[in-house]
UniProtKB/Swiss-Prot annotation:
Protein name: PTS system cellobiose-specific EIIB component
The UniProt record lists the keyword Magnesium: no
Residue span, PTS EIIB type-3 domain: 1-100
InterPro entries to which the protein is assigned, alphabetical: PTS_EIIB-like_sf, PTS_EIIB_2/3, PTS_EIIB_3, PTS_sugar-specific_EIIB
UniProt note: domains: The PTS EIIB type-3 domain is phosphorylated by phospho-EIIA on a cysteinyl residue. Then, it transfers the phosphoryl group to the sugar substrate concomitantly with the sugar uptake processed by the PTS EIIC type-3 domain.
Annotated localization: Cytoplasm
UniProt function note: The phosphoenolpyruvate-dependent sugar phosphotransferase system (sugar PTS), a major carbohydrate active transport system, catalyzes the phosphorylation of incoming sugar substrates concomitantly with their translocation across the cell membrane. The enzyme II CelABD PTS system is involved in cellobiose transport.
């Protein structure tokens, strides 16, 4: 599974990406997880199975949902509590539920 995280600059999600990769490994899930800035995101959408947006750019959800729907890719906002706590396992579970 390919999980794309989008945030304002692509840096604030880097620790979350690390925690999500650790959680995937512990659960035996093969996942490619990466983060990019909102400006770079469009060029990465075709590689993703799920797109998660950082809460700080939730105002861009409608635009990214439209792009995702055109490609058959679910798009949603990361829960602010999970994002703030860097809950990699929780965000990974959310991504898996979106893909089902």
């Amino acid at each position: 599974m390919n999980i794309l995280l989008i945030c304002a600059a692509g840096m604030s999600t880097s620790l979350l990406v690390t925690k999500m990769k650790e959680a995937a490994k512990q659960k035996g899930i093969e996942a490619n997880i990466w983060a990019v800035s909102a400006d770079e995101a469009k060029s990465h959408l075709d590689q993703a199975d799920v797109v998660l947006i950082g809460p700080q750019i939730r105002y861009k959800l409608a635009a990214f949902k439209k792009e995702g729907e055109a490609r058959g890719i679910p798009v949603d906002v990361i829960n602010p509590a999970d994002y703030g706590r860097v809950n990699g396992a929780g965000v990974l579970d959310f991504a898996l539920r979106l893909k089902k």
